[in-house]
Amino acid sequence: MTQQNAHSEGKCPVMHGSMTTNNRTEKNWWPKSLNLDILHQHDAKTNPMPSDFDYQEEVKKLDFSALKQDLIALMTDSQEWWPADWGHYGGLMIRMSWHAAGTYRIADGRGGAGTGNLRFAPLNSWPDNANLDKARRILWPIKKKYGNQLSWADLIAYAGTMAYESMGLKTFGFGFGREDIWHPEKDIYWGSEKEWLAPTNNPNSRYSGERDLENPLAAVMMGLIYVNPEGVDGQPDPLKTAHDVRVTFARMAMNDEETVALTAGGHTVGKAHGNGDAANLGPEPEGADIHDQGLGWLNKTTRGVGNNAVTSGIEGAWTSQPTQWDNGYFHLLLNYDWELKKSPAGAWQWEPIDIKEEDKPVDPENPNVRHNPIMTDADMAMKMDPEYRKISERFHSDPAYFADTFARAWFKLTHRDMGPKARYIGPDVPQEDLIWQDPVPNGNANYDIDAVKAKIAASGLSVSDMVTTAWDSARTFRQSDKRGGANGARVRLAPQKDWQGNEPERLARVLPVLENIAKDTGASVADVVVLAGNVGIEQAASAAGVNVTVPFLPGRGDATQEMTDVESFEVLEPLHDGYRNWLKQNYVVTPEEMLLDRTQLMGLTAAEMTVLVGGMRVLGTNHGGSKHGVFTDRVGQLTNDFFINLTDMKYTWEPVGENLYEIRSRRSKDVKWTATRVDLVFGSNSILRAYAELYAQDDNAGKFVEDFVAAWTKVMNADRF
């Protein structure tokens, strides 16, 4: 070997190899640039399944009975490499299901158990999810056996439900149908902290004022699911912790009764692990060595499993019989006084004073040894907070009521992000309709669509009226938790009919016209609202010299006010809508960033966003009739004028106020139009400008109309399952 060869062998043979690890991205170089990547996730390039694979159809082929039996058998099939406490994996599986579902937050519908994202960073390596990697490996033989008919997302949620059944709880039911993603989500904001479990006073704190938690977050620290089990910032104080519990659970759509039920029911079985030194634990899965094969928190200095495992640092079981569903949690919590102690790992925990020997749980590995039960600071909040205490006492005195309330709350926890009941699959789907499922009755599809369209066209409503009303009805859809959308026509009900963004006065004028047409034709109001938007677009395209038929799928139903939880729907209120060039007020986040967020929640791509904004502007759909961004002299005609004038270099753009710009002639300096940041971004951002230029081309006037119609139809049908 020559010296030259020896020297070259030490170098990376692929000169761009660093691009696969720690390269600086465009966002690093230009932090203010838009992250359009959130609009381009989970596509064919990352999904290994064929394009015609439909999980909702595939899961229907699953042998549900066999799966249930396999999971029940797995619960007591302890593995030497990660032994089950008391020979039962129930507590571990419940914690896994809970932590997968518990990331859901109502503000944007993101998080939750619906995608199997617990397999990926950052969730797979959060401190609060320590050792849940072991739970997934224990489940792997079942996933391997059932293959494509069973997603990880369904299995992770179902394992906890089966764990409860195996320990004696009558569960409320279960619905399959969660489809896996194949890489981490890029759209979820988990917080701005730069370290795990950063205290409240850290420089990037999620708190302000009197412990006001930043929206949309629903956990008190980076890396936790809900609250710190040791207390606020690790300092025990049950009443302060009660505040954190109430806020975080409310942001997951749980009331006080559901909160107590879930806290107690979650801690009725299983145990916390802290019998050792946390300093001996290796890194989390994403930081572990390659030969650890995706497992983290490994203790390579001592036994580190079973009785010697360290997870939260708290050590012990909450109840006397941790593998059996019973009312023991409240018996211990309410009948004993508790004092603060430190676990072997140094974590704060509460232990009973003068407890009877028979009330102590036995050791997980030695039935001849008993230990004190424990409570976390959150558990003590169930006793110390006056409202939680009342609920706890009722549950204590009525075990059947507690069991039913918990079963329902657990079902809600594990299904909250699945959307309407129509998406549930399997033999155990409950027949009962629940208000949080946003029920919509079946609609009529057997009516003369052309006759309805003719009545709409003759109604005297303008293109703007028709398109805007349909848009406002449909834009509430969130692909995150499948809530909102045009189905149900809730745009005519409280609270939506009164939202500022929906222009209540316009709705009060337009909706009665459409409701009368629905009554006369047998169509639902929901269908007529969407059809009106389609009619408006067809008229606008025709006025521009293009004949087009907007596709329509009938059969939407009309929800009633009784089917609508007003408070629950308040979180869907738009505080901004870049498509209609509207902001309720100025925010710290820029209007264009909010447009991206809205677009991602609606399930649209950057190209679809571009063509929709350009089309909506020329159709005259701006909120309040604003002229900002209406770059056309032919309002009401579906033309590509927005893009033509946006990209025309005979104009200059000058700021004249916050989020306001004037478009002036370079030559005369006369003001031609006004615009907002949402308009300008399509000429400023290099990617969006590329799309804008495409639609401004002389040969793409027809393509613009075709693409607008396709994107519009996607929005109108987004909630049809």
From Swiss-Prot:
Cross-link (Tryptophyl-tyrosyl-methioninium (Tyr-Met) (with W-98)): 226-252
Cross-link (Tryptophyl-tyrosyl-methioninium (Trp-Tyr) (with M-252)) at residue(s): 98-226
GO molecular function, one term: heme binding
EC code(s) of this entry: 1.11.1.21
Quaternary organization: Homodimer or homotetramer.
Functional note: Bifunctional enzyme with both catalase and broad-spectrum peroxidase activity.
Name this protein carries in UniProt: Catalase-peroxidase 1
Species this chain originates from: Vibrio parahaemolyticus serotype O3:K6 (strain RIMD 2210633)
Lineage of producing organism: Bacteria, Pseudomonadati, Pseudomonadota, Gammaproteobacteria, Vibrionales
Gene name of the encoded protein: katG1
